[in-house]
């Protein structure tokens, strides 16, 4: 959005959260020698100062239609809701020359018995509760994963002073990315036990681990729904074990995790390259590339091993 805005294009930035910025609001990665949330604030401040930019938080883009038309539902702020003269919700019809989807990806769970007990959460949710809201979801936290992102949760929880009991990774051929935490490689959770909430987990080797919170990460599925509204057909990405957008409309591009790109460095570079091409085709001036010193996030995932 910032690259396009600096080039002089009229921008509408739609985000379903009440704070713009996506997952950067709950991460601890470094950008240009500072935490990503600080970098995000500077970007948003610049966007707010530009007259050619319209920011629309609390807004869900629900439909992609012919001729670059999109449907969006905006939920007004609580202050507006308390005023009878103003609407609580607004239905928008947006006409665009081009759209860039940065809708991210949803984390997958992993199946095991009683995996719906209270206290069992997706790994990224646990991490964001800690980083964004300062909330500890449990006193003795375990992590069950088949990818590197589960270890990122362990790293952030440990940094915040949480007690990470154990990491169970389905993969057996990896070097643990985080040190000084008990871990089991090539292991699987068979069953969760508890009454009102989880109290322990049983592994396939017979070991029982006492825990009051289990963070689960089974990889990510890109949010590609809007790319399918005009006959787009997703294709399978074997490396990241997920479906990615394919056969996009001519006036649509997908960037970042929504396109199956999970490395932050590749994400920034991919965004810059695609936006430069889009702006050139639309007749806007070229903007000088901005250098980013960003923490490299390694993302490797393996399917559930066959026994």
Language model regions located:
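Residues forming the flavin
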Residues: 1-307
